[in-house]
Design a protein with these regions (language model features):
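Short, charged/polar connector segments at secondary-structure boundaries
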Residues: 1-86, 95-142
């Protein structure tokens, strides 16, 4: 695993919206983000794991730019996007996905319990407290 990130311009088609993303983005959230991007442009680093193609952070921004660009997954609508590329193994990707989600927005603990095994992830490294981890364990036991 290489530490840090490298700024790159890649094709949108290289990005997978992370299926384990524990944040829920409503249509209203995306619409608000889209309006802001149209006003001031795309600001901030979109964190992308080059190893898996998965996003770590920036799902709402990418979904908003998709709407602006009319992206539908076809080569005709593909576009260039600036990302902060990292080279993480799957475990580190998941830990950072959780860390970024927890540090920015309220997260859905049910999604965390569904998508992340207590035995698989170091929840402390992902920014979770002992109480958070106990809550996730309880949800997994249900």
């Amino acid at each position: 695993m290489k530490k840090g990130s490298e700024t790159k311009i890649i094709k949108r088609s290289q990005i997978n919206l992370n299926p384990c993303n524990p944040k829920v983005h409503t249509d209203a959230d995306i619409k608000q983000q889209k309006a802001n991007i149209k006003k001031v442009g795309l600001i901030g680093g979109i964190q992308w794991n080059e190893t898996t193609g998965n996003l770590i952070d920036g799902h709402k921004r990418v979904m908003s730019v998709d709407l602006i660009q009319g992206y539908d997954g076809t080569p005709e609508t593909d576009y260039d996007i600036k990302v902060e590329a990292v080279d993480f193994d799957e475990k580190t990707e998941k830990e950072q996905l959780l860390f970024m989600a927890k540090s920015q927005d309220p997260i859905d603990y049910n999604l965390v319990a569904k998508n992340f095994s207590i035995d698989e992830i170091d929840f402390k490294a992902a920014g979770f407290t002992k109480q958070d981890t106990e809550q996730i364990k309880l949800l997994q036991d249900d």
